[in-house]
């Protein structure tokens, strides 16, 4: 892969969370239930009890230890600061309470649009996908324009229709990338949408596998070769990636990596960083 694509100067900033410029939207707008990922129940539109008056989290450095693994794994792809600073022009929901409910409805729509942009941006950085870069760029610019619509128009968007269009080009990108892998004889159970909860996949050659939407919860992927593998939408909570090689894998988000376990020997693509909780 290369990082040659610069659709505008702040692309990397725009597509990653900047909590300092957000009104704590993920901590308010989104609901969650008490579980292994969250320490207590919270309704959508209700501020988390850990959200401070400055919109920062009081336990941010200790989220996993305090029972909020779900928060540590969440990624808004920059939607939070876009809604806070651009869509609502810096007017926060506490000082402008009449905007609160609408803002909380706009945020998840923006998050989905920014997620699409993140995937498209990655596709545009892949040299092997150059034959379709023109179409990818056109699609990126179309979705990016949607993110700058008014709050009223954002609420009327048919997000699923736009996601279907984006997915068409992401699928083509995936096919181009995975075709470059030496195709080993993959286990039959390893395929798109596979249920691989707790699966024993240690040390397997899974290069070029299509793991789109696969359930990899607590899967043992230690020392597995996962190069040029498509991870889009895969649930990787508690998957063990210790010693695994994921270089050249595609559509692997920081949220997925944060939800998994690994170690200093895990090789990750350049688009994500090693989580602090990995040993």
From Swiss-Prot:
User: InterPro entries, from UniProt?
Assistant: 5peptide_repeat (IPR001646), Pentapeptide-BTB/POZ_domain (IPR051082)
**SUPFAM superfamilies with a match to the protein in the record:** Pentapeptide repeat-like
Q: Name one Pfam family in it.
A: Pentapeptide
Q: Which PANTHER family match?
A: BTB_POZ DOMAIN-CONTAINING PROTEIN KCTD9 (PTHR14136), PENTAPEPTIDE REPEAT-CONTAINING PROTEIN (PTHR14136:SF37)
Query: What's the protein name?
Result: Uncharacterized protein YybG
Question: From which source organism is this entry?
Answer: Bacillus subtilis (strain 168)
Q: Which gene encodes it?
A: yybG
């Amino acid at each position: 892969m290369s990082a040659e694509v610069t659709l505008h100067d702040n692309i990397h900033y725009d597509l990653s969370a900047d909590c300092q410029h957000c009104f704590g939207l993920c901590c308010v707008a989104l609901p969650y239930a008490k579980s292994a990922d969250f320490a207590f129940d919270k309704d959508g539109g209700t501020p988390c009890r850990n959200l401070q008056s400055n919109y920062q989290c009081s336990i941010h450095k200790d989220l996993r230890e305090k029972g909020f693994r779900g928060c540590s794994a969440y990624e808004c792809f920059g939607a939070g600061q876009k809604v806070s600073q651009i869509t609502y022009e810096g007017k926060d929901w506490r000082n402008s309470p009449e905007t609160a409910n609408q803002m909380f409805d706009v945020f998840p729509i923006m998050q989905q649009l920014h997620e699409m942009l993140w995937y498209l941006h990655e596709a545009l950085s892949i040299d092997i996908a150059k034959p379709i870069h023109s179409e990818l760029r056109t699609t990126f610019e179309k979705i990016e324009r949607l993110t700058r619509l008014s709050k009223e128009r954002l609420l009327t968007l048919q997000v699923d229709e736009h996601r279907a269009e984006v997915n068409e080009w992401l699928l083509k990108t995936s096919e181009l990338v995975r075709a470059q892998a030496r195709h080993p004889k993959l286990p039959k159970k390893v395929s798109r949408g596979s249920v691989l909860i707790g699966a024993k996949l240690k040390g397997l050659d899974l290069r070029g596998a299509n793991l789109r939407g696969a359930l990899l919860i607590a899967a043992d992927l230690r020392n597995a070769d996962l190069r040029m593998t498509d991870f889009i939408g895969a649930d990787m909570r508690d998957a063990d990636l210790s010693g695994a090689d994921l270089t050249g894998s595609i559509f692997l988000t920081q949220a997925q990596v944060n939800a998994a376990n690994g170690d200093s020997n895990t090789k990750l693509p350049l688009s994500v960083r090693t989580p602090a909780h990995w040993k």
